[in-house]
Each structure stands twice: as C-alpha cells, then as structure tokens.
C-alpha cells in the first residue's frame, strides 16, 4: 500500500547557463493540497506534515522539497513521493533514489534538459516534428542582433512558466521595448527566445506516459505515450493565452467537439505529440501547447514537463480544474480517477 507524501517547491531553482526559471508563489502548494485532499477523501493513505491538516491551509498538506522536508515525510512513514515541484539535476530528491522509494513525476535530470524551450524545440525539429521558427537573443545582443525572423513575433523566456513573461510584438520598436523590459527585470536571466507567431487556433494536448490505465472500468495497456483529448484555448489577451494563475482555465478553455477531435489536423498533431513523449521518455503527464498556421497545420510551440494538476477537491477550489483535468473528463475520468491513474505509473530508480 502506498503512503504518499506530496512535495512542493520551497526555493528558486539554480540559474542554468544564465537562465532563471521563476518560482510560482506558494511553490505549487495549492495544487499539492488539492491532490492530497482528493486522494485522502477517497481512501488513499496520505502522509501530511501535521496530524489534522486544515482544509484551508495548503501547507498543512504538503512537504517542502528540501532534504529536511523529504526526511520529515519518510520519518512519518512515506514510501511514495509525488514530485509536484520544479525539478532539476541534483535536486534534493535525487539523494533518496536508492532508498527503495516510489515516485510520481518526471526524472529531475530529464526536466533539467527539456525545460529549456529552445533546446527542446531543436530536438523536436530534428525529429521532423513541426515547431515554429525561432532564434535566441541575449542581453549583450540588445542593440546589435540580426533578426532572422519576420514580424509578428512572440518573445518568451527560455525556462518560463506558463505564459508568464510572454509577449507578442508586431514591429522593431515593440521588440526592442519588450527585450529591454525583460532583460532589465532580470527575472528570467539574460537570454530569451524569439518565435514566429502563428495566427490560427490554439490547443493544448496532455500526453500520458506508456503504462496500464483504467478507463471506464476497463484496464487498458498503452505500449507508447498517448494523448488525452485536445482542449482549445480562447479569450486570449494580446493574442497570448493568459496565465492560469490569473484566469481560471474553465473560463477560457474547452475540449474540442467530437467532430473536431476526429479531424485530420488533430489526429496529425496527436501523432507529433505522442512522438515527442517517446523522444523525451516521459514518466508522467506532459502538456504541449500547439497552434495552427493560416492553413490549419498545427505546430508544437511549448512543451510543459510539469503541467498544473489543480482540481476542485476542496469547497473553496471548485473552479480550479486544470487543462489536463478538462481533457481527462472527456474520457470519463473524475479528478480522483486522473490522480489514481497517475499513481499507477509510479516508478522506482
């Protein structure tokens, strides 16, 4: 029987090659508490920092992803860790990989590699997966760079979080102002990604790892990564989907219709997303944002190694479906069934 402890992010990740990944306020303790409460109320044994956690206090339900936090959870009987945190090479959790523990989430070393949006896009491109044209700009290049792309462009952090720090620019002046602002702020480091803007429909696709799942009471074995139904995004702000920490996704996202889900374009982008999941050898769900060009062809423009897993488990969180949960509902999963199927994919080192 699993004794599950949920980890949250307690501190900023280290700067890597001059690039800083920003930290979400609370370090995903909100989704961690959602997960813990949903599992606990459905009979799964959850280890918490205190004996009687308060439903309104996120930190009562989750452990910090520090050496002390992990040891505290183990001392209370945890044998499985849900890695609901930002991972990277030499993360504290790696020191516990030889302790015969189980883990739910990605391998830190892989997240460290594929959190780099430019590197990941190049991996996908080299494997014939369609991604937008892009180029890197450093703070040293601010007045000297040569633009190899045509406007409009999207300016985005290399190791960003959701749509935070992402802006659309339509001309040279807007680009200069955006670069100057992002570099002077220093929140994302001294390198950013410029990407060709695609003006078609935006969708997001959750890719599940290979494994055995229970869907509508039937056990199904997937030999390769597979896709949950695509979700379309709308109500963009300045052509960019707003960060879901500011606007609940149920207000700007909807699973595609049955006819849309059967379309050639969607089936084609599914195959690209599944291939991406295979290339990355994922151990847990990832979410891939895709956008169509003027001809309806979809390109993969953002791969998220740690999709949000919020859910309406607590009374005050009833509008907190994640994009992945919207997809999961389409195949008949509740929030608990999504989480239970993620537990089924737990791994040991």
Locations of regions flagged by a protein language model:
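ATP-binding N-terminal substructure of ATP-dependent carboxylate-amine bond-forming enzymes
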Residues: 1-103
